[in-house]
Amino acid sequence: MSEIKDVIVQGLWKNNSALVQLLGMCPLLAVTSTATNALGLGLATTLVLTLTNLTISTLRRWTPTEIRIPIYVMIIASVVSAVQMLINAYAFGLYQSLGIFIPLIVTNCIVVGRAEAFAAKKGPALSALDGFAIGMGATGAMFVLGAMREIIGNGTLFDGADALLGNWAKVLRVEIFHTDSPFLLAMLPPGAFIGLGLMLAGKYLIDEKMKKRRAKTVVNEIPAGETGKV
């Protein structure tokens, strides 16, 4: 149970692929102009990570070490192709918005990295959980960045959600404030860099506060007579 909890915590926060490892920067910065696009690509990446980790872990004993990387890429490419066809069939609007960034998941360092660092060494169930946790951590970071840029740039949230979830999702659109002209800095790549920098700073501050809180807890748990001992 502790190993499962550690995998989840590492994937979602401590070893977050976007905010700690800084992997997958190309789609993170390019696609997160809206919360819907960010959520769509994040969920697609999560599905790819989960399925590829599961497949690679299952086949790890029969995978020759010398050619493991090409085999990993073939497996990842097959899964990405299947996910791309699913998005094309059931969320065509999102498919058009994401464009080339769906097939580019094949070359995403997050996917290849987890295959090599985790799935090739652990069992299928734990590897699938790792892929899911890492994917959801990346999705969360992408969603927060996309929501921030969409709100500042257009004054809306979940604009175009029907492209991802269907016609019923039009009711999810929220107009936070009205603007006749979008704030282009937030919508363009420089805004993505600024937003990511703010998120990195925010995570650092949260981690520092958590460290101080844990240190205080440890000090309070030490008996008064032992605090002066070396």
From Swiss-Prot:
It is found in: Cell inner membrane. The keyword Magnesium does not apply. Keywords: Cell inner membrane, Cell membrane, Electron transport, Membrane, Translocase, Transmembrane, Transmembrane helix, Transport. It is a multi-pass membrane protein. The gene is rsxE. This is Ion-translocating oxidoreductase complex subunit E. GO terms for cellular component: plasma membrane. The keyword Transferase does not apply. It holds the Pfam family Rnf-Nqr. The complex is composed of six subunits: RsxA, RsxB, RsxC, RsxD, RsxE and RsxG. The chain crosses the membrane at residues 18-38, 39-59, 63-83, 86-106, 128-148, 182-202. One of its GO terms (biological process) is electron transport chain.
